A protein has these predicted regions:
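Right-handed parallel beta-helix
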Residues: 147, 156, 199-224, 260-287, 293, 301, 334-345, 368-379, ...
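Short, glycine/acidic-rich beta->alpha junctions
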Residues: 108-112, 133, 141-142, 232, ...
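Generic beta-strand/beta-sheet core signal
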Residues: 131, 153, 257, 311, ...
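Catalytic domains of carbohydrate-active enzymes that cleave complex glycans
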Residues: 453-454, 458, 474-572
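Extracellular "leader-to-stem" segments immediately downstream of a signal peptide or signal-anchor
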Residues: 2-131, 136-351, 523-572
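Extracellular beta-strand solenoid repeats
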Residues: 129, 136, 142, 151, ...
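Glycine-rich beta-solenoid repeat tracts in large extracellular/virion proteins
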Residues: 140-144, 157-172, 182-184, 188-195, ...
Length: 572
C-alpha cells in the first residue's frame, strides 16, 4: 500500500489442478456447517454439531478464559451492531429515477444518485432505491449521511458502470511518507461511504497536495478533545473507571485514545510483550510509530458513578504511562449502507504496482455500524476498503474481473469489522508485468477484524506490516498465490493474537497461512499440510513466539468449524 514493496509477479502458483473445480467443491465444505453455538453449549467447550470432528485443547482453554486468552482474540462482537444478524430495512424515502437517473447505460446518473442520497440525508435517513438495469456513473457516488442506505435490485440486476478514476475525479494523491506512489493504490472508492465534513476536508487536502492522515481525528490528527481520562485496566474488561462522566451518556460513540511512550512499551504490548519485543528496534520504524496513538471507537452502554461500561471488551491493557483517555472525534457515519448492486469499472489494464489510478470499488471511511451486503465489484484496482472504519459488516461481497491490487483492504486503524461470505474470483486476464496481487489485507494497527466463510480463487492473507494484531481468518478456502506487501519502516507483519482457524490451502503454499513460525502469540488451527515456496518470511521477533499449532494436516476436522460463529455464543 503506501509502501516500497518488492516488485515482481503476482506470485507462484503450483500444485492445483482445475482450480475452479477444486475451489468450488471446497466452498460447499466451507459453508455447509456453521456452529452458532448457544451460550451453554459453547461454554462447555463442546459445540453442537461436532460430529466426527475434533475439538482442540485451545478451544476448551478459550471458553474458560474468552476475553483474556493469550493466543485467541475475542471477536464475538465484531461487525455492525455487535455482529447482529438482524438487518434493519429502513423505508424507501427516495428513488433515483425521481431525481433524473435513467438506467439506459449512457446517461450519467452520478449527479442524480447523489441528489437522492443528499435528500435522504436531509430527511433523517432512509433507503435510496436504484432500479434494475445499468446506470452509468461519471463521478463518485457518496453516501455521506448517517442512516442512509443505497439499495439496488440485487447484484445480478443493478449495475453501476463507472467511467472515470479517482485521479481524474479528485486529483493525484501522493503519499504522506514521500516517494512517487499513488495513494489511490490503497484509498478511496467510486462508491465512498464517509461523513460529509470528513470527506470534504480529506479531498480538499488532496487537492492542495497536503497529504492527510485519513482517520477519526482529522487530517493532522488534532481534531479531538478529552472527555475523561481512564484508570488502569486489563485487556478484556468491559467496564472502566474514568475521571469524569459528566460528558458521557449511554449510546455515545467515543474514541479510546492510547499513546505510546518513549520506550515503545505500547507497541511491545500489542506484540504480546514476548521476549523478542525488548530487543526489537522500534525507533527506526518511523511509519509504524506514526500510527500511534492507537484510536479505538466504541459505544458507551452504561454510566454508573465514575464507571463506564463499553459495548466491547478492552482490546489492550491500559497503563498510566500510555495516558489512556476517552475523547471526541471528527465525526462518524453510522447506520449507513450499500446493498444489492454491482459496481463495474472499465476493463483497462492495471497500472504498475503502487501507481493505481483509482478505479476503486466500495470504501468505508470513518464509518461505524455500517453495512455492505450483496455487492460485487468488477475490474477494480482495489475492491472493498475499510479505512479508519470500525464495527462494520461486509456480507456476500465479491471481487471479480480482470484482477486487482487489493481485493480487500483494512487499514488506518480499522477495528472490529466482519467480512463474511466473501469471494475473490480468479482473474479473467493475465496479470501485467510489474503489478502485484495481495488478497485480504490488514495493516496499520488494525485489530479484532474477522474474515469468515470465504473463497479465494486467488490472493493471500496479506498481513501488510504496520503490526496489525488480534485478527481472525476462519473457514476460508484459498489458492494462495498472492504476496504480502509492506515497507520495512512499517514494522512487523504481525502483532499478537492472530488466529487462522479451519483454513484449506488448495495449492499447498505455506506463506501467511501457517503462521506459528512467524506471528507472536498466534494460533494456527485446522490447516492442511503446506510447504514453503515463493515468498518466504522470517519472524520479526527473536526468541520464543509462544505460538500454537493444533490439528495441523487436517481438512475441515476442527470443531467448532468457524471461530467467529462459535464465539458469538460466548457473552458477558
Amino acid at each position: 500500500m503506501s509502501h516500497d514493496e518488492s516488485r515482481g509477479s503476482a506470485g507462484g502458483y503450483a500444485g492445483s489442478v482445475s482450480r475452479r473445480g477444486v475451489l468450488g467443491g471446497a466452498a460447499v465444505v466451507a459453508t455447509s456447517a456453521m456452529t452458532g453455538a448457544p451460550p451453554a453449549a459453547a461454554a462447555s467447550g463442546t459445540p453442537p454439531g461436532a460430529g466426527s470432528g475434533v475439538v482442540p485443547p485451545l478451544w476448551r482453554e478459550f471458553t474458560r478464559n474468552p476475553f483474556t486468552h493469550p493466543q485467541l482474540p475475542f471477536v464475538g462482537r465484531a461487525g455492525c451492531r455487535g455482529g447482529s444478524a438482524r438487518q434493519t430495512r429502513p423505508r424507501v424515502v427516495a428513488d433515483v429515477r425521481d431525481f433524473g437517473a435513467v438506467a439506459d447505460g449512457t446517461t450519467d446518473c452520478a449527479p442524480a444518485i447523489n441528489r437522492a442520497l443528499a435528500a435522504a440525508g436531509r430527511a433523517g435517513g432512509g433507503t435510496v432505491a436504484l432500479p434494475p438495469g445499468t446506470l452509468r456513473i461519471d463521478g463518485i457516488v457518496r453516501v455521506a449521511h448517517s442512516g442512509v442506505v443505497l439499495r439496488g435490485a440485487g447484484s445480478h440486476r443493478t449495475v453501476l458502470r463507472a467511467t472515470r478514476h479517482l485521479t481524474d475525479l479528485v486529483g493525484p494523491y501522493g503519499s504522506r511518507y514521500g516517494g512517487d506512489k499513488s495513494s489511490w493504490s490503497w484509498a478511496g472508492g467510486l462508491i465512498w461511504l464517509a461523513p460529509e465534513a470528513r470527506w470534504n476536508s480529506l479531498t480538499e487536502a488532496i487537492g492542495a497536495k497536503q497529504w492527510p492522515f485519513e482517520g477519526w481525528t482529522g487530517n493532522r490528527r488534532d481534531e479531538w478533545r478529552t472527555l475523561a481520562t481512564v484508570s488502569p485496566a486489563r485487556r478484556g474488561s468491559w467496564t472502566v473507571r474514568v475521571s469524569d462522566t459528566s460528558r458521557l451518556r449511554p449510546g455515545d460513540l467515543v474514541l479510546l485514545r492510547v499513546a505510546d511512550d518513549a520506550d515503545h512499551t505500547l507497541l511491545a504490548h500489542m506484540a504480546g510483550d514476548g521476549p523478542g519485543t525488548g530487543s526489537y528496534s522500534w525507533d527506526d520504524k518511523t511509519k509504524l510509530t506514526s500510527y500511534v496513538p492507537y484510536e479505538w471507537p466504541v459505544r458507551v452502554t452504561e454510566v454508573h458513578g465514575r464507571r463506564v461500561t463499553l459495548e466491547r471488551p478492552l482490546p489492550l491493557d491500559l497503563r498510566p504511562e500510555w495516558d489512556p483517555r476517552l475523547t471526541t472525534h471528527a465525526g462518524a457515519l453510522t447506520g449507513a449502507g450499500v446493498e444489492g448492486l454491482t459496481l463495474e469499472a472499465p476493463e483497462v489494464p492495471q497500472q504498475p504496482h503502487l501507481l493505481d489510478l483509482g478505479y476503486n470499488g466500495v470504501v468505508l471511511q470513518c464509518a461505524y455500524d455500517c453495512r455492505v451486503d450483496d455487492v460485487t465489484v468488477r475490474n477494480a484496482d482495489n475492491g472493498f476498503g475499510l479505512v479508519a472504519a470500525s464495527a462494520c459488516t461486509l456480507s456476500r461481497t465479491r471481487v471479480a474481473g480482470r484482477g486487482s491490487h487489493h481485493p480487500y483492504f483494512c487499514r488506518e486503524g480499522s477495528h472490529d469489522n466482519l467480512i463474511e461470505d466473501f469471494t475473490v474470483e480468479e482473474r479473467t486476464t493475465p496479470a501485467p508485468a510489474d503489478t502485484q496481487l495481495h488478497g485480504i489485507n490488514v495493516e496499520g494497527l488494525s485489530s479484532y477484524n474477522v474474515w469468515s466463510r470465504g473463497v479465494m480463487e486467488m490472493g493471500t492473507f496479506d498481513s501488510h506490516r504496520g503490526m496489525p494484531f488480534a485478527n481472525v481468518r476462519t473457514e476460508i478456502t484459498v489458492d494462495n498465490n498472492g504476496r504480502h506487501g509492506g515497507d520495512a519502516s512499517a514494522g512487523p507483519l504481525f502483532g499478537a493474537r492472530f488466529a487462522h482457524w479451519n483454513i484449506r490451502v488448495t495449492n499447498g503454499r505455506a506463506g501467511l497461512m501457517r503462521i506459528d513460525g512467524l506471528a507472536p502469540w498466534s494460533a494456527t488451527v485446522g490447516i492442511n499440510e503446506v510447504r514453503e515456496f515463493d515468498q518466504i518470511d522470517v519472524p520479526d521477533f527473536t526468541g520464543d513466539l509462544n505460538a500454537r499449532l493444533e490439528l495441523y494436516g487436517t481438512t475441515d476436522a476442527v470443531r467448532p468449524r468457524n471461530l467467529y460463529e462459535a464465539q458469538r455464543g460466548l457473552g458477558r
